[in-house]
């Protein structure tokens, strides 16, 4: 496999399937990641995954990766984490931002993202399918001639 994509999931996403299923859906994060790994394998792309409720662990994973692309759902860190934004900018790896819910249709404090202005694209409101869209876009971008 010639390409690698890092999938980063932020706080509370380990509770998918149990936490507010009317907002976030019934699939678990393990189910979503398994489907994405299969999608990546079919495209001959390696998908590395990290989920953490600890900001520093996400930052360390971003610093350590040798991936050519990142897909990130920063979750609640979307609205608060300059440090996570700086980690992404520091490694200069292109990234897509994903959110399960439509953050713009929710509480006002969720409307601001520290990542959107630097992301290749933002996908929100499509539930777990948003990850599939982001992965397809990342794979397509990686396979484009330089």
Curated annotation (Swiss-Prot):
List of catalytic residues: 24, 99
Listed NCBIfam families: aroQ, PRK05395.1-1, PRK05395.1-2, PRK05395.1-3, PRK05395.1-4
SUPFAM superfamilies: Type II 3-dehydroquinate dehydratase
Catalysis: reaction(s): 3-dehydroquinate = 3-dehydroshikimate + H2O
EC number: 4.2.1.10
Subunit structure comment from the entry: Homododecamer.
CDD domains recorded: DHQase_II (cd00466)
Listed pathway(s): Metabolic intermediate biosynthesis; chorismate biosynthesis; chorismate from D-erythrose 4-phosphate and phosphoenolpyruvate: step 3/7
HAMAP family, A to Z: AroQ (MF_00169)
Site (Transition state stabilizer): 19
Keywords: Amino-acid biosynthesis, Aromatic amino acid biosynthesis, Lyase
Annotated source species: Shewanella baltica (strain OS155 / ATCC BAA-1091)
GO biological process: amino acid biosynthetic process; aromatic amino acid family biosynthetic process; chorismate biosynthetic process; quinate catabolic process
One GO molecular-function entry: 3-dehydroquinate dehydratase activity
Protein's gene: aroQ
Annotated residues for binding of substrate: 73, 79, 86, 100-101, 110
Protein name (record): 3-dehydroquinate dehydratase
Source organism, top-level taxon: Bacteria
Intrachain S-S bonds: none
Gene3D superfamilies reported in the protein's UniProt record: Dehydroquinase, class II (3.40.50.9100)
Family assignment from sequence similarity: Belongs to the type-II 3-dehydroquinase family.
Function: Catalyzes a trans-dehydration via an enolate intermediate.
């Amino acid at each position: 496999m010639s390409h690698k994509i890092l999938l980063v999931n932020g706080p509370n996403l380990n509770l998918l399937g149990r936490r507010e299923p009317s907002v976030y859906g019934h699939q678990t994060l393990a189910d979503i990641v398994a489907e994405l790994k299969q999608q990546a394998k079919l495209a001959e792309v390696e998908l590395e995954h990290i989920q953490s409720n600890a900001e520093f662990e996400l930052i360390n994973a971003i610093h350590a990766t040798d991936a050519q692309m990142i897909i990130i759902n920063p979750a609640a860190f979307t609205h608060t984490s300059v440090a996570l934004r700086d980690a992404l900018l520091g490694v200069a790896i292109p990234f897509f931002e994903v959110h399960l819910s439509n953050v713009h249709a929710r509480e006002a404090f969720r409307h601001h993202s520290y990542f959107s202005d630097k992301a290749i694209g933002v996908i929100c409101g499509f539930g777990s399918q948003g990850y599939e869209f982001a992965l397809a876009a990342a794979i397509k971008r990686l396979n484009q001639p330089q």
